[in-house]
């Protein structure tokens, strides 16, 4: 477990925010911003291989396509809870199924030797093309239920069209006969009723139901008695049409609910792929190289290591040129103390090394010259800041003491180099780096 205090001191959340800008989907963006740090070296190694495979794919000009992928997690939950999905939500499901299928085709289209990890990741991905086709059969591009969704719906809509035409024709005839009673020759609507704008003094010329009046009271909007019965029929047909459309939406929602667990797995795979793609693109942008996790008897080698946040600042905010550092440590070293004058780069060096360790753990390449060789470190602990007196800030001072206590407790768990204990040393014991201010 890496404490959030340490991550904040190293400005890890800022790096995650930068990583998220390379994601292609909302799912990937959110996952990058809330990046999980693996608990085992095997998990980190798996993520690194994913990054390398996507990196290779990008270099071949065949990057992963994420078009059409939507965050449908809430829609799946709604369907599982017997809610009703609307047309737009169903289209999002269909679009995501299609997008996931394109992702799988791109990955499966490569040689198994080139993308073994990614192909294993999508091997059990179910994209339900028949569900996608059924949704598009029943829902048009605007999210409305289509006439072809059911024979009953088509019949109701034919009747609706015919009834509207009858109403329009009758109103046209009334307008021709009673033109002098109208404010203007116009058929309009109030609510779901068709009405004519009649001059108030001549309302008796067109008997019917008054549904509205103008602000001045000079115009009354009257539904002529001759079309009231048709208006009632129209309203009934509209209610029947709405009910039938909801039947279609309910059927489609139930089909989505029936496969919701598979679709949740699909979203998880898509998110993992988008994260891998974001890591690869961010690594390429940083001109970084893949790290190799070394054993306890190998030296740490980080040449021309650059602080990733300073690289971002230089390129996006016209910051100063980033000065690279070299970190070369033999396996025999137990502690490294960095000394030097103020503003000499000690803190930046510590933060750069801390971020390099974290980047390797989450499957990112490290912005250093090849070879990039460092141990997989389980615990990363940091206490970075200026000296504080108790009088200046008791809370700040207490915070320093608490963090230093954690570091010392972790150091007590590391066996000395000359131990004769039958228990072997930890395979990746942390090498503390202490700034002179501590």
What are these regions (language model features)?
Residues 156, 160-163, 237, 241-276:
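Intracellular alpha-helical coupling/juxtamembrane segments of multi-pass membrane proteins
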Residues 186, 190-221, 231, 293-324:
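SMC-family hinge/dimerization module
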Residues 80-86, 108-114, 170-185, 278-289, ...:
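Active-site phosphate-binding and catalytic loops of NTP-dependent enzymes
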Residues 1-152, 156, 259-262, 266-272, ...:
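Conserved amphipathic alpha-helical "coupling/scaffold" segments
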Residues 254-315:
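Phosphate-binding P-loop/Walker A region and its immediate neighborhood
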Residues 154-203, 282, 299:
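Extended, Lys/Arg-enriched charged tracts that mediate electrostatic binding to polyanionic substrates
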């Amino acid at each position: 477990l890496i404490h959030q205090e340490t991550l904040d001191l190293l400005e890890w959340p800022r790096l995650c925010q930068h990583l998220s800008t390379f994601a292609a989907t909302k799912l990937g963006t959110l996952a990058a911003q809330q990046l999980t740090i693996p608990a085992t070296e095997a998990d980190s190694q798996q993520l690194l291989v994913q990054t390398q495979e996507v990196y290779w794919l990008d270099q071949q000009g065949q990057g992963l396509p994420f078009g059409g992928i939507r965050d449908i997690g809430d829609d799946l939950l709604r369907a599982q809870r017997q809610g009703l999905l609307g047309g737009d939500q169903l289209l999002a499901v269909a679009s995501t199924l299609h997008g996931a299928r394109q992702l799988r085709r791109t990955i499966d289209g490569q040689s198994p030797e080139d993308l073994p990890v990614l192909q294993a990741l999508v091997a059990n991905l179910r994209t339900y093309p028949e569900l996608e086709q059924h949704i598009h059969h029943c829902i048009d591009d605007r999210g409305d239920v289509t006439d072809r969704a059911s024979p009953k719906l088509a019949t109701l809509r034919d009747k609706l069209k015919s009834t509207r035409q009858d109403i329009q024709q009758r109103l046209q005839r009334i307008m021709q006969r009673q033109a002098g009673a109208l404010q203007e020759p116009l058929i309009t609507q109030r609510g779901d009723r068709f009405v004519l704008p009649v001059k108030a003094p001549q309302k008796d010329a067109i008997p019917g139901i008054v549904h509205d009046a103008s602000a001045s009271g000079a115009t009354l909007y009257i539904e002529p008695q001759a079309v009231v019965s048709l208006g009632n029929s129209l309203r009934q047909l509209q209610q029947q049409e709405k009910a039938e459309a909801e039947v279609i939406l309910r059927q489609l929602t139930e089909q989505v609910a029936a496969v919701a667990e598979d679709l949740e797995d699909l979203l998880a795979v898509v998110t993992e792929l988008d994260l891998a793609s974001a890591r690869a693109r961010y690594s390429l942008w940083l001109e970084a190289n893949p790290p190799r996790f070394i054993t306890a008897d190998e030296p740490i080698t980080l040449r021309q290591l650059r602080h990733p946040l300073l690289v971002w600042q230089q390129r996006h905010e016209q910051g100063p040129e980033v000065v690279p550092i070299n970190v070369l440590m033999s396996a025999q070293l137990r502690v490294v103390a960095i000394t030097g004058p103020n503003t000499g780069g000690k803190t930046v060096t510590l933060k750069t090394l801390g971020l390099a360790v974290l980047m390797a753990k989450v499957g990112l390449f490290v912005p250093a010259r090849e070879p990039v060789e460092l141990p997989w470190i389980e615990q990363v602990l940091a206490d970075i800041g200026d000296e504080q007196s108790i009088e200046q800030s008791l809370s700040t001072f207490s915070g320093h003491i608490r963090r230093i206590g954690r570091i010392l407790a972790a150091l007590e768990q590391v066996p000395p180099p000359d131990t004769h204990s039958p228990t072997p040393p930890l395979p990746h014991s942390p090498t503390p780096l202490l700034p002179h201010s501590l």
